[in-house]
Amino acid sequence: MGKTDYFERKLDDKRRLTIPTELRDELKSGVVITRGFGQYLHMYPKQVWDEMVEPKLDGDILDERIADLNVQFRTGKTEVELDDKQGRVTIEQHLLAYASIDRDIVVVGVGRYWRVMAK
């Protein structure tokens, strides 16, 4: 992960989150945003999603635990591109509603991904 493991932001009127400059290279391959396990979101670099999360979701289709993870992570999952000019990503309204996020947010690094939460 980059140097920044915590930041606070206000979403703009178009639901865009500005990413700190030092994290933008890590997210240039794209961003996957999905529901977390609690009332927050997960934000993954696309490469991390493809290499680490997606393979875990492709387990035994009869394994109830894997099925539950698929429902949790795929419900509302969005893939977005980082805006090159301003370094922003747009968060879909249904994900904001799930996490009870209005405008003020906190983003915390958790290993290779970030938790996005209401402030």
Regions found by a protein language model. Give the residues of each.
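Flexible "stalk/tail and boundary" regions
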Residues: M1-R9, D13-K14, E22-Q86, Q93-K119
